[in-house]
């Protein structure tokens, strides 16, 4: 199968991705100023359709010739009904909890049904975790954030305890559980693709001046075909528990949090970028806890002295450099999520100079 997509890093260019056995190979399709498309200049085509048809007949340097186009992996996002598009408070009686999927510090997650027909995920928040009025105000914003790489908020139940958060259901659960379980056989290209998906969702939040505050593998959900979506964005700032205090709370995720946020409560999209660098280490180590062997206090002390986690075993230096860029001391020096997205999406893209040896890649 193959897929042609517009390049994130170079508008006007395109990328061609081809599945070859267990691997996916990527090639850059360039566009000429005077019109026309090519992978290598010895074969220039008037349209993308002409290019695809040519490589369907012969590989001419590609790893294989093009066969079937890739089918869309994701169903379009929908609301529960036309009523819930603008009215997100629904009756608790309309939700049926089927089975428990997991539990976190502040609640549990269930597979459920809305009106006995629509599969949903239901996050229940422990009593006292956050003020319902504050959450409802935040939900008004969250409901409007729509992107293929963000978990879609469908509705809420804030009348009574526990508060229910109703979202789309993802078949594989949290990225952390997935990495520690069946995803252990995934290779680097798939892991980097998952990181790129997370970066794409975060780039959308960045564009809308929205901060996640708790970006980590446990807050990414995975569906079929390794589709990843960012979940729980914005909820961390609403938590009122003393255990979630940056300086002394036992439940505060110090190891994922940028120093300026952990020490001075200075959260920003750039502190999310720091957390994203930590998330990449979770990916390439299949869910290992960051800074193994260190306490939270030791992590903060060492970071202040300039310490950064070493490059994980078998991780390419170029990927480790992306992590280091995320962990720069000055938040302003860290990359944007938009830049991270295209760096990761184009991590394995081949230029024409590498094109003849494509079969040797990956």
Swiss-Prot record:
Leader peptide range in chain numbering: none
Organism name: Spongilla lacustris (Freshwater sponge)
Annotated protein name in UniProt: Tyrosine-protein kinase SRK2
Superkingdom of the source species: Eukaryota
All copies of domain Protein kinase, residue ranges: 95-348
Domain annotation SH2: ranges: 1-70
Keywords: ATP-binding, Cytoplasm, Kinase, Nucleotide-binding, Phosphoprotein, SH2 domain, Transferase, Tyrosine-protein kinase
Cellular component GO terms held in the UniProt record: cytoplasm
Catalytic reaction list: L-tyrosyl-[protein] + ATP = O-phospho-L-tyrosyl-[protein] + ADP + H(+)
Sequence positions that bind ATP: 101-109, 123
Underlying gene: SRK2
């Amino acid at each position: 199968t193959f897929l042609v997509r517009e390049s994130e890093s170079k508008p006007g260019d395109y990328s061609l991705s081809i599945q070859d056995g267990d691997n996916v190979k990527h090639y850059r399709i360039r566009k000429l100023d005077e019109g026309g498309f090519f992978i290598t200049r010895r074969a220039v085509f008037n349209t993308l359709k002409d290019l695809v048809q040519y490589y369907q007949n012969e590989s001419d340097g590609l790893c294989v010739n093009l066969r079937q186009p890739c089918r869309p992996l994701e169903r379009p996002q929908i609301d529960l009904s036309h009523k819930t598009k603008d009215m997100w408070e629904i009756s608790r009686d309309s939700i049926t909890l089927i089975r428990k999927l997991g539990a976190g510090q502040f609640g549990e997650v269930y597979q459920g049904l809305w009106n006995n027909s629509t599969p949903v995920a239901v996050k229940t928040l422990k009593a006292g975790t956050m003020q319902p009025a504050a959450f409802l105000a935040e939900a008004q914003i969250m409901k409007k954030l729509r992107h293929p790489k963000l978990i879609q908020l469908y509705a809420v139940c804030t009348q009574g305890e526990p508060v229910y958060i109703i979202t789309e259901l993802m078949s594989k659960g949290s990225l952390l559980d997935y990495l520690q379980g069946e995803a252990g056989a995934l290779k680097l290209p798939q892991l980097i693709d998952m990181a790129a998906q997370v970066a794409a969702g975060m780039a959308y939040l960045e564009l809308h001046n929205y901060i996640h505050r708790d970006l980590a593998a446990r807050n990414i959900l995975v569906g079929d075909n390794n589709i990843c979506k960012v979940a729980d964005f914005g909820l961390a700032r609403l938590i009122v528990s003393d255990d979630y205090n940056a300086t002394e709370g036992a439940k505060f995720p110090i190891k994922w949090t940028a120093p300026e946020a952990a020490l001075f409560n200075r959260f920003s999209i750039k502190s999310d970028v720091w957390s994203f660098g930590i998330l990449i280490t979770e990916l390439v180590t299949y869910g290992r806890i960051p800074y193994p062997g260190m306490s939270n206090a030791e992590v903060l002390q060492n970071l202040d002295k300039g310490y950064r986690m070493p490059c994980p075993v078998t991780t390419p230096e170029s990927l480790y450099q992306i992590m280091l860029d995320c962990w720069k001391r000055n938040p302003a020096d860290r990359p944007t999520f938009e830049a991270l997205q295209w760096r990761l999406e184009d991590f394995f893209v081949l230029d024409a100079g590498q094109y003849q040896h494509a079969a040797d890649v990956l």
